Amino acid sequence: MRNTNLEQRKKISGLSSERSDIILAGISIISCLLEATGAKKLITSGCGLREGLFFDYYSKENHVPIIANDILKMSRENVLNLYEPDQQHSRHITHLVLSMFDGWSELHGLRKNYRRLLETAALLHDIGITINFYSHARHSAYMILNAKLFGLTHKEQVITAAIAGWHNGVSKNYFKDRFYKELLSDANWKTINKLALLLALAESLDYTETSQIHVIEPGINKKTATLKLYAQGIPSIEMHQIQEHLSWFKKTFGVELKVQLATAAEE
């Protein structure tokens, strides 16, 4: 790069012509940093100096730590508050779906890292309602895909968006037709299918958005998976709604799902 002139650098693929005059100074700084730290790779941030200056100012003015303990948690809360869906419903759905993920770990066989992707998708699965209620799942997927969700790789953000979109009828073909389709393998799509199914089950268990079903107990034996529901009264609509996903469950996990409402004595 040092042996090129300005006109030659303007023709370098991937290098903005607006940066061709200052790129050498920037590269020199990065080169010194890598040499001083002994690092072998550099991960770039989507944020710039202006964001750093803002966070520094905000931290001092509001007396909050400048470094977040969980940057993904903070950024998804920002998105959730920005679009203001029914947060009680979103948080309840998240509680239910994480109970399934933990209780059926042997069944789905997924790494714990996917738990935070599922949690993010569940919290934000309804933000698309701000655009259109009837096709909100697709809009939620698009909004998650383009949101400032720090703490996720590009691939993880696509997976999170696909989970939120697929749980309510958006097929994987919608995502496979987009330019980022090459990010996801067939194995990724199988994972997304499992997580989208769990989110769909959780959504059906609060279909009336009243949190009537407050606790669930997922279980598994050799031939079936079980789901015991603890509710206030008889959640007839939710009990009916979950039936729509039983065939999807059997196709995905290869076992029947038995749903049982706990008796008053069990509660």
Language model segments and positions:
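Short, surface-exposed beta-strand/loop "edge" segments at domain boundaries and coil↔beta transitions
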Residues: 233-237, 267
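Short, non-transmembrane amphipathic alpha-helical segments
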Residues: 237-257
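Helical "lid/coupling" subdomains associated with nucleotide-phosphate turnover
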Residues: 1-201, 205-209, 216, 220-227, ...
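Short solvent-exposed loop/turn micro-motifs enriched in small/polar/acidic residues
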Residues: 209-212, 252
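Flexible glycine-/small-residue-rich
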Residues: 122, 229-231, 261
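A short amphipathic beta-strand at an alpha->beta junction
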Residues: 253-267
